[in-house]
Regions:
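Short glycine-rich, acidic/polar surface loops and turns
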Residues: 117-119, 167, 173-181
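A short, acidic, flexible beta-alpha connecting loop/helix-capping segment that sits on the rim
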Residues: 195-199
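Outer-membrane beta-barrel "beta-signal"
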Residues: 3, 180-189, 205-216
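C-terminal outer-membrane beta-barrel translocator/porin domains of Gram-negative envelope proteins
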Residues: 1-129, 133-162, 202, 210-215
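Exposed loop/turn and edge beta-strand positions of beta-sandwich/beta-sheet ligand-binding modules
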Residues: 39, 174, 206
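Glycine-centered small-residue hotspots that permit tight backbone geometry or close packing
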Residues: 84, 90, 159, 173-179, ...
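Short amphipathic alpha-helical interaction segments
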Residues: 104, 108, 164, 168-172, ...
Length: 216
């Protein structure tokens, strides 16, 4: 596959930014003549604002889209996954979106997620240890097992039939929460507690989550 990328970083600090913008775009294409002919397009946007003298407001948004071409299907192992730290906290990592007949997450070829966070330094600590509050939203769409009018899976030739989901912003999952972020000697650490706002019966919930690495 051919991959290309572009990024621009205007943040005032790479580890503890208080103002500025970060953008990243990425593409991946399975070239004609190869076994898999597909493409993936990704874009990430971050903006940081000094809300008050010691409070920073941060926005992160990500969008991704992939598909096959020349009659080839989009490879399932290139699917996007949403849920957990880095997308929608309060839900299990990678658990949102379509589920297979065995209830395992399938991911999808379309993703959208965004977060709004407010950071404030913890009193008595340096600026690398901060408390935060956040709002997350996101979802992933793709192929899902088809169901009949009774809600049963459609089976043909002994195998489930899959149909492409419609991209519906009404499917977005939302959560709010609090957490702590620390730029440790091992790298960025983040601990969060989230409350899902519009969980469905099939959603997998994980309120406490921990992450090492990546700022958002």
């Amino acid at each position: 596959a051919l991959t290309t990328g572009w990024s621009r970083d205007d943040r005032d600090n790479l580890l503890v930014p208080t103002r500025g913008r970060y953008q990243r775009a990425f593409s991946e294409v399975g070239l004609p003549g190869l076994d898999l002919q597909y493409y993936r397009l990704n874009y990430q946007f971050q903006q940081f604002f000094p809300l008050f003298p010691r409070v920073t407001l941060a926005f992160n948004g990500e969008i991704g889209y992939g598909d096959g071409y020349s009659g080839d299907p989009y490879p399932f192992f290139k699917n996007y996954y949403v849920g957990g730290i880095g997308s929608v906290r309060g839900f299990e990592t990678g658990s949102l979106g379509p589920r297979d007949v065995d209830d395992s997450p399938l991911g999808g070829n379309r993703r959208l997620n965004f977060s709004l966070e407010a950071y404030v330094p913890i009193p008595g600590a340096d600026r690398t240890l901060r408390a935060l509050t956040f709002v997350d939203a996101g979802q992933v769409w793709g192929l899902a097992p088809a169901r009949d009018e009774n809600g049963n899976f459609v089976i043909a030739n002994g195998r489930p039939v899959y149909e492409d989901q419609r991209t519906d912003l009404g499917d977005l999952r939302y959560s709010v929460g609090i957490g702590v972020a620390w730029i440790s000697p091992l790298g960025p650490l983040k601990l969060s507690y989230a409350y899902p706002l519009n969980r469905e019966s099939q959603d997998r919930i994980q309120r406490f989550q921990f992450q090492i690495g990546t700022g958002f």
